[in-house]
Amino acid sequence: MNPIGGTELQVKLLEKYVDSKLLNNFQITTSVPEKIPLAKDKINILWQQNSYDQPNLAPWFKDKDNHKKYDWYVFNSHWCYEKFRMVYKVPTERCTVIKNAIDNFPERKIHKKGDPIRMIFHPTPWRGLNIILGAMQLIKNENITLDVFSSTKIYGNEFMDNNDDTYKPLYAQAAELKNVNYRGWHSNDYICKHITDYQIFPYSNNWEETSCISAIEALGAGLHMITTNYGALFETCSEWPVYVQYDTNYKNMSECFAYAIDSVIDYLHHDRCQEHLQMQQDFYKKFYSWSKRSLEWTNFLEGVLNAKS
């Protein structure tokens, strides 16, 4: 299986929603500079989805002579751009921000008082699976359960073979907890199809995201989200989630997440909360849909092409 993470999903959507004739004028490389040789007959763009501190790209950016190799740099969040600007002094006149987006906005389900509260955790395991499992050990309300789809398989079989053993103790812990169901890897299509079966996305993130497709999908489906203010999450998620302060003490974070999750049962069914979730979904339909993002990409690419001619 080839990698099908957030970056690969965004590339597929770009190719789906932006005119292929326009795209053919460009070579767009994602995240890791020069993993594809620079094209001599096209405009070279580096579409940056990774964090500034990743070891597979940091050495390249530290050498300022490399910066001239790409005609443009596209960043997936203002947070991501700011980090590269501050750390590597990237050429700001050749940088722009175009955020990630989705095209799945299912009909939102209304939660009623007394209904079971089902939660979903579908990011990779190093993005806080240990913290949410710690929280679930503290939650005693039998009406609250968590389905875990976390896996390294999302980045392909080779990546899984090299890295999955590290997280098998967490998978085993998830399988043993009474209020947790370990589901393992499922395709993004499956997640999007079934995401409204859940009411909450508790994203106990302790990995600096530059954006977050899982968050956008959950918020765009009208799920209530509890997350940290780490990395770019406060930008991607805006004012819609309940935020748990990021803490280097993961035991404290687990306790805070447990408290936040336990509190949900008191308000999730309230009209005011349901109105909030409807406004949230409307917000993501308006600002994070590919119908909007395709216009941003088209305008940007046409502008670059016109300036080149």
Give names to the regions the model predicted.
Residues 71-85, 90-107:
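Donor nucleotide-sugar binding/catalytic pocket of nucleotide-sugar-dependent glycosyltransferases
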